[in-house]
A protein has these predicted regions:
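Select transmembrane alpha-helical segments in multipass membrane proteins
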Residues: 15-26, 50-54, 92-106, 152-157, ...
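Helix-loop-helix connectors at the membrane interface of multi-pass transporters/channels
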Residues: 2, 9, 83, 116-145, ...
Length: 461
């Protein structure tokens, strides 16, 4: 009886109209703040070209295997992560792995939307022509410590995400991706061309694109693994969910390759947008390159303020960042809504309402964590930093390990190969077998242990 109900429920699931819709939706999920905000500052900090080389190698191997695995499991079961794990599990405890994948986006999307609100705030200021004001020392700190301002812009971003999700898979997620992703690419190319043609930018291009072994360290590898993990939307439940929406005749291997090429291409464009501009502004000052997360909100506004077309550049850049942030936030939200629809058997509208409540409560804690709620610290971190650490450094490696265990102990590698080959020949079958059995679990354990050691002060990342 249970199987009949599930069949009926799965029959009524949303679906993508075709491979292009799926690829653009997954690319939209992968191309976000991870590419445009996180990737450039990590590349700048960890050696430029050598970081880029390691990142590309890992994406083409480790990332490829995990994207294919999660997508295939979603298509195989026609369920979001909790249902997918339950489908194969012999006991109810097996659902823990699924819930781990499902809870991650519920925790990420609130603080992600807080940062999305910051992006809208900066975009509005550039439209007002306040290019010099946003470049002033202390502007960013004063803004995020003003709790009510930060909360207002968080709610604006959250409302945009909610409106798109309410439209469903084809009318909301797919339609948004088909419009926003091409626009994002065009804007990225425009800003990149402008950035690399600035005086002194050539040195920045060389630093970013040409690997220098002298800049290599073990932390370069750890940082590249972590970035790949974050950027490709692995272990967030997104790929399970979107996989459950695709048709059985879709070529998973080809689609995975297209997603990785698109994602890596945008990451490289982001690096070329930001690093040469910073070189041009600072003359390659190492301290400027080490700015880290503040690179986009503190360093770049100073770069734009020094340009002849700073206001126009700032507008185009922050529109680009907003589009990227929206596509990723929508993917995170859709995964959570899909989980509630599967597990609670509620309507999309009702599940959206529940997710909005979660989003506002946790998002408010994050947006006010630099102001009214700054006195609350968890392991020395405010709410936003704590949610970021727990999801990216602890829960995501564990969730991906759970997927590896599910494949190795229950589904079987042969079962995965059979599912992938339903639509087309599996060209990199041998690579898949080796990586899912040995390399992926080892890499995930390295990420987990390195992140914990970093927080404990044993190593410095």
């Amino acid at each position: 009886m249970k199987k009949e109900n599930n069949s009926a429920h799965n029959h009524n699931r949303g679906s993508f109209s075709g491979r292009i819709g799926y690829v653009l939706a997954v690319a939209g999920s992968a191309v976000g703040l991870g590419n445009i905000w996180r990737f450039p500052y990590l590349a700048a900090k960890y050696g430029g070209g050598i970081f880029l080389l390691i990142y590309i190698l890992l994406t083409a191997s480790f990332g490829y295997v995990l994207i294919m695995s999660e997508t295939a499991l979603g298509r195989m079961t026609r369920k979001s992560p909790v249902g997918a794990f339950e489908h194969f599990g012999k006991t109810k405890s097996f659902k823990i792995g699924g819930w781990l994948n499902a809870v991650i986006p519920m925790l990420i999307v609130p603080y992600y939307s807080t940062i999305g609100g910051w992006v809208i705030k900066y975009l509005v200021e550039y439209f007002k022509g306040n290019v010099q004001a946003v470049a002033e020392d202390g502007y960013f700190g004063n803004f995020i410590s003003d709790s009510w301002q930060a909360e207002l812009w968080f709610l604006v971003f959250a409302a945009l995400v909610f409106i798109i999700i309410l439209g469903g898979v084809q009318n909301g997620v797919e339609r948004m991706s088909k419009i926003m992703m091409p626009v994002l690419v065009v804007l990225a190319v425009v800003v990149t061309i402008y950035s690399v043609t600035r005086p002194g930018a050539v040195e920045g291009v060389k630093y970013f694109l040409i690997p220098n072994v002298k800049n290599f360290s073990w932390m370069t590898v750890v940082a590249a693994i972590g970035q790949m993990f974050y950027s490709l939307s692995i272990a967030m439940g997104i790929l399970y969910t979107y996989g459950s929406y695709v048709r059985k005749d879709m070529d998973i291997e080809r689609s995975t390759t297209q997603v990785e090429v698109f994602d890596t291409g945008i990451a490289i464009l982001a690096g070329l947008m930001i690093i040469p501009a910073v070189f041009s502004f600072s003359g390659g000052n190492p301290e400027t390159l080490q700015a880290g997360p503040s690179l986009m909100f503190i360093t770049l506004p100073k770069v734009f303020a020094s340009m002849g077309f700073g206001t126009a550049t700032g507008i185009v850049f922050f529109i680009l960042v907003l589009l990227a942030a929206l596509t990723s936030a929508v993917s995170l939200m859709e995964t959570s809504v899909s989980t509630f629809m599967d597990e609670l058997h509620w309507s999309r509208k009702k599940c959206c309402g529940l997710m909005v409540v979660i989003m506002i409560v946790l998002g408010t804690a994050s947006s006010m964590g630099y102001g009214l709620l700054d006195f609350i610290r968890i392991f020395g971190m405010n709410f936003l930093d704590f949610f970021d650490f727990m999801t990216n450094s602890v829960m995501m490696p564990l969730a991906a390990l759970a997927t590896c265990i599910l494949i190795l102990r229950v589904v079987g590698i042969d079962g995965m190969v059979k599912e992938i080959e339903q639509s087309s020949p599996f060209r990199r079958k041998k690579l898949y077998r080796v990586f899912i059995k040995y390399f992926a679990p080892i890499c995930l354990i390295i990420i987990l242990l390195s992140s914990i050691a970093n927080v404990l002060g044993i190593i410095s990342m």
